[in-house]
């Protein structure tokens, strides 16, 4: 198992939505603002991935876009951790796009990052664990 390095001030953190697009909805703007403020107070630099704030319908209908965000985060050497914005029962749909993608698999193995998420993001924890990453 590969254990990612701990975070330090100035590290970039990717924000992904692997299941639901709730974080991009107007009624959650205050939660997004609070999260960004808290991460910045910790000295971290939040990076919202391209699809993370798209509406709920788009996110639900496009698991490949959600998977692309996670792949992009792992391929970016500047990003040191990935935070899932929300859990949800739709995250499992990202797994085929990732586990059949050699670039993603190589990125996880060669660019280990802290990965955190709750609820059904456990599917992604298991996926990363199978690739040798301690989450």
Give the label of every model feature segment.
Residues 1-78:
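ATP/NTP phosphate-donor binding region
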Residues 59-67, 71-135:
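Active-site histidine-anchored catalytic micro-motif
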């Amino acid at each position: 198992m590969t254990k990612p390095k701990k975070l330090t001030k100035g590290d970039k953190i990717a924000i992904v939505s692997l299941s639901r697009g709730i974080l991009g909805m107007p009624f959650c703007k205050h939660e997004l603002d609070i999260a960004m403020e808290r991460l910045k107070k910790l000295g971290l630099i939040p990076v919202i991935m391209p699809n993370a704030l798209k509406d709920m319908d788009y996110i639900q209908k496009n698991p490949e876009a959600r998977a692309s965000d996670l792949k992009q985060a792992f391929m970016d050497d500047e990003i040191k951790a990935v935070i899932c914005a929300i859990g949800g029962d739709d995250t499992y749909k990202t797994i085929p796009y990732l586990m059949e993608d050699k670039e993603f698999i190589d990125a996880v193995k060669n660019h280990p990052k802290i990965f955190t998420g709750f609820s059904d993001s456990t599917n992604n924890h298991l996926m990363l664990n199978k690739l040798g990453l301690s989450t």
